[in-house]
UniProtKB/Swiss-Prot annotation:
Its cofactor is Mg(2+). This is Ribonuclease VapC1. It comes from Methanocaldococcus jannaschii (strain ATCC 43067 / DSM 2661 / JAL-1 / JCM 10045 / NBRC 100440) (Methanococcus jannaschii). The lineage of its organism: Archaea, Methanobacteriati, Methanobacteriota, Methanomada group, Methanococci. Mg(2+) binds at D21, D101. Toxic component of a type II toxin-antitoxin (TA) system. An RNase. Its cognate antitoxin is VapB1. Residues 18-129 form the PINc domain. The keyword Metal-binding applies.
Amino acid sequence: MKILKKLKKKLEKEESKILVDTSVLIDYFKKRRLEELGGEAISIITAVEFIRGISEHKQEQVLNIFKELFEIVYIDEEIIIPFSKIYRQLKKRGMLIDDADLYIACTAIIKNYPLWTKNKKHFERLKEFGLKIYDK
């Protein structure tokens, strides 16, 4: 019985991806452990933030690595309403975060992926909107 429960938990975990934030991506890249994140997801915003910070001659190569390793989640019309609602609420409270981080958080909320970030405190204010923060 215990073995079945463990197997079920493992399968459930494997089915649910994690949205990796730029801060975690940079950390793993610097440690040359990027492949350990393979199979997870990144926002197109994360890809842009990361690639703009590396030398131009490496950008195409890194983008191809990202395409191989990750599900790249694009921004589409599904994000418009949730982004706008959360933005208004945060603005009203004087708790705005920059648009790029809000896009990343809304992507995680819409896809129901926990967000793995090193900036947990920064994203905490979005938990009430359904953001789950992954804690390794």
